């Protein structure tokens, strides 16, 4: 077994908390946790601690919540902990070079893609959106660039035809902690090999927007179906009927060679709501109308049949 490392962990959401949990269960010593300040959440907008903070407090690990690292005080607070390494997972704050240089072995990051593909904020969603066959996690030595650091470990898994961003998030949240603990062993015993990224293969996973999730019927059905899975659970692919936003939870592609205008309903029955697109048909199997839970297509047709008559055009 490698020697234990003195680790500072920095992260915020549940995805990060699962990695912190693996570190706590390892033989390494988590000496401090950084997470974003408590934020208002829920209907009452009550200040709420992040999942990472809650887990750290359960294990009596000191928690630090600076707004940023611009002040000398915040930088000194970090330096005083005398850490070997800082592990960063979905922290949400930019780390200046002074912070990256503070731990003896620097900072490493767990990123939700196979770098250099999908650098940036939404790698899980963009991999599904683009129709990638696989994704994974990359553990890299952090530098000042955006996900540009040398790669220390890559773990991969296939993207199944039914995977959504929600399901892939869960899969990577299981894959990442295992890869992280393995990587820490390599770092501790000096066997980790850093591999530079090929910048020519890099692309950027920009943040999702609600506007992007509005279905463009001129796209081909395959692309629309990918969007449905990529934008689940947020911001959810949607279209409009009588100015009502309808969210799409599940869809499939069917061959269609007719000449109906994209956005036109060409069939509606218990097998689905078939809509013409730029190429082939998209078939909706599960939808959500405002104020209701997601429903199968038969329930939708029973309650809102007039919205989905053959020949109607969806916006």
Curated annotation (Swiss-Prot):
Cellular component GO terms, alphabetical: cytosol
CDD domains: FMT_core_Met-tRNA-FMT_N (cd08646), Met_tRNA_FMT_C (cd08704)
Keyword Transmembrane: no
Protein name: Methionyl-tRNA formyltransferase
Reaction it catalyzes: L-methionyl-tRNA(fMet) + (6R)-10-formyltetrahydrofolate = N-formyl-L-methionyl-tRNA(fMet) + (6S)-5,6,7,8-tetrahydrofolate + H(+)
Key words of the record: Protein biosynthesis, Transferase
Broadest EC class assigned to this enzyme: transferase
EC number of the protein: 2.1.2.9
Species annotation: Aliivibrio fischeri (strain MJ11)
Listed Pfam families: Formyl_trans_C (PF02911), Formyl_trans_N (PF00551)
PANTHER family: METHIONYL-TRNA FORMYLTRANSFERASE, METHIONYL-TRNA FORMYLTRANSFERASE, MITOCHONDRIAL
